[in-house]
């Protein structure tokens, strides 16, 4: 998993509350368990005017010119600005996979659905909770200024605006450690590899019939 330390990223504003995981990545794209390849179908039903199915070439589809991800000024954005209860709905881990595959490294919102919030940390995305008033200000600044960027420092737990405003956010120490060091669940387990090997060796001595 890619580590997250600091980010100076272009912001894309998604001004909708209660964005659920089916909107983030529709159910017909959930057949694959590979983490890569979901980016072209992120927000598929909003992003395109035609109905998407697995295997369709995005280059041949009809984009929705009004959807924010299709506006040239937001091309290459790595910070998603969202509203309340982002990531609600089913617990599909494909949702953060699609966001990460598109290039989103951080999401800022007043609140997140719990399971989605947890899944972000497991997939290299930093979900940042800021109060609604601060998020409102960021939306206003972003929509008023092309090329709007935010600087995010996970170690210091800060978001800095182009005008110099510093917004502080909270993050669990364990989750922070995971992101700073690029550790997913497998990576965390491998940190204990020596202890696991020692335990298995001891169990072979204590209960050899289990390994027969």
From Swiss-Prot:
Molecular function in Gene Ontology: 3-isopropylmalate dehydratase activity
A GO term from the CC aspect: 3-isopropylmalate dehydratase complex
Pfam families cross-referenced by the UniProt entry: Aconitase_C
Gene3D superfamilies for the chain: Aconitase, domain 4 (3.20.19.10)
Annotated metabolic or biological route of this protein: Amino-acid biosynthesis; L-leucine biosynthesis; L-leucine from 3-methyl-2-oxobutanoate: step 2/4
Enzyme Commission number(s) of this protein: 4.2.1.33
Catalytic activity: (2R,3S)-3-isopropylmalate = (2S)-2-isopropylmalate
GO biological process: L-leucine biosynthetic process
Keywords, alphabetical: Amino-acid biosynthesis, Branched-chain amino acid biosynthesis, Leucine biosynthesis, Lyase
Matches recorded under SUPFAM superfamilies: LeuD/IlvD-like
InterPro entries hit by this protein: 3-IsopropMal_deHydase_ssu (IPR004431), Aconitase/3IPM_dehydase_swvl (IPR015928), AconitaseA/IPMdHydase_ssu_swvl (IPR000573), IPMI_Swivel (IPR033940), LeuD (IPR050075)
Annotated TM spans: none
Disulfide bonds: none
Signal sequence, renumbered to the chain: none
Subunit architecture: Heterodimer of LeuC and LeuD.
Recorded family membership: Belongs to the LeuD family. LeuD type 1 subfamily.
Role according to the record: Catalyzes the isomerization between 2-isopropylmalate and 3-isopropylmalate, via the formation of 2-isopropylmaleate.
Protein name (database record): 3-isopropylmalate dehydratase small subunit
Protein species of origin: Thiobacillus denitrificans (strain ATCC 25259 / T1)
Species classification: Bacteria, Pseudomonadati, Pseudomonadota, Betaproteobacteria, Nitrosomonadales
Gene: leuD
